Structures are given as C-alpha cells and as structure tokens.
Amino acid sequence: MAKDDSTVRCFQGLLIFGHVIVGMCGIALTAECIFFVSDQHSLYPLLEATNNDDIFGAAWIGMFVGICLFCLSVLAIVGIMKSNRKILLAYFIMMFIVYGFEVASCITAATQRDFFTTNLFLKQMLMRYQNNSPPTNDDKWKNSYVTKTWDRLMLQDHCCGVNGPSDWQKYTSAFRVENSDADYPWPRQCCVMDKLQEPLNLDACKLGVPGYYHSQGCYELISGPMDRHAWGVAWFGFAILCWTFWVLLGTMFYWSRIEY
C-alpha cells in the first residue's frame, strides 16, 4: 500500500478518528466504573451478604478495560501513522484479550439485574438484621454491616423494611427473636424522628398511627441505584464494543494491505 496515496491517507484519518473515540470511551468507562465501585449509596454490604457481588466485579473489570482501551488506542494510532505491521499485530493480540474481558463484564452486569429481587433482600434482612448469634465470625461481620446499612437506610430515606413495616410482623426474623412484639413491632428506625433523632411519638409509632411511622418499603431505594449501575456498566460497555468492533475490523483490513 503506497503511503502517499490520498485514499490511504483518508482511510488512515478515519481509523485514527475511530481510535480517538475508542480512547475517549475508555476514559469515560473507567470514570463510570470508579463511580460505581466507590459505592455512593453504601449498599455493598447488602450485596456481599448475599455472596453475590458480581456486579462490583463487572465494574472492576470495566475499569481495567477502560484503561486498556485508552492505552491500546494510542498504540493503534502510532501503528497506523507509521504503517508498522508489528505494532499493529501487537495491538490486535492485546485488543482481542481486552475485548473478551469487556464482553464478560457486559454479560455479568446485564444478567445481575434479575438478581435484585424483593425476596433476596427480604430473606437477607430477616436473617441478618440484629442477629447476635451468628455461627461464624464471617457471619458476625456480615450481620453487623447489614444491620448498620439497614439502620442508615431507614433513618436517612424514611422507609421501613423491604416492602414495608408489615415485613417485621408477617415473617419470622432474628429481630423478632431478640425483641418482643409489643415493644418492638418494628425497629425504632421506622419511627418518624424529631431533630434529635428520637421518635416523635414512640407509643403512636408502636401502634402504627399514620404520620408517626414510615409505611414505605426500602426496596426501590436499594434496587434502583443497583439497577442503574448495572445497566450503565452493561449497555455503555456494549456500545463501546460495537464501535470498537468496526474500528478493529477496519484496522485489520488496513494491516492486511501494508507492504512488508
């Protein structure tokens, strides 16, 4: 392929533009995944206690892939400008590996959405909230963080239980074993609080008087952020894969035409 051919120069320009976009997308993907793994809503303990925090694993992979995409796009641009077969061959080998990792990240993130069900968080809450008799130290740690997370959620977001306060009444739970139904029909955090974080009217809260306890469940406040992050990692990653596929295909065609 003659390097002074205007058609070749135009094709080189298109490939360079394509790789610039790939590099920028890599930076954006890394930033998105960093935001996700930083756990802005502090919900990681709830996922870890289910022994399935794969969505965070997908985000860590996405972060690694984003950095690699940026570096490889720079390598590809250098190889295209120099029309160097060896540089581009090294680029292809590494890009295929990175591409495979990103496919795994997208699939993992997309499939995790079906995992975030009400029954999952309900079972976990009933089993671990204020459970002071864990069988192992690992369970003790998980119970402690699950309890702290639920206390914060109910106080901060003005909700109670997964579906509502009735969760504490209808189902057997570690909380019910530790507390009497008369004094603690539901956790104190379900009560409407005053400025000092004390129940506005404890008796009214225990009796379930409207306006003195939170009747809304916390499920939407838990699943919403997780779903958004899962779809963000999955579909933005998928869009990057689609763009990268065509850029990679064009680069392979260019590589095949470079003279030895």
From Swiss-Prot:
SUPFAM superfamilies: Tetraspanin
GO biological process, one term: response to bacterium
Keyword Membrane among record annotations: yes
Extracellular topological intervals: 37-59, 108-229
A family per Pfam: Tetraspanin
Signal sequence, start to end: none
Entries under InterPro entries matching the protein: Tetraspanin/Peripherin, Tetraspanin_EC2_sf
Location (main, coarse): membrane
Subcellular location as annotated: Membrane
Keywords linked to the UniProt accession: Glycoprotein, Membrane, Transmembrane, Transmembrane helix
PANTHER family according to UniProt: TESTIS-SPECIFIC EXPRESSED PROTEIN 55 (PTHR47110), UROPLAKIN-1B (PTHR47110:SF2)
Similarity comment: family membership: Belongs to the tetraspanin (TM4SF) family.
Function noted in UniProt: Component of the asymmetric unit membrane (AUM); a highly specialized biomembrane elaborated by terminally differentiated urothelial cells. May play an important role in normal bladder epithelial physiology, possibly in regulating membrane permeability of superficial umbrella cells or in stabilizing the apical membrane through AUM/cytoskeletal interactions.
Protein name: Uroplakin-1b
Gene this protein is translated from: Upk1b
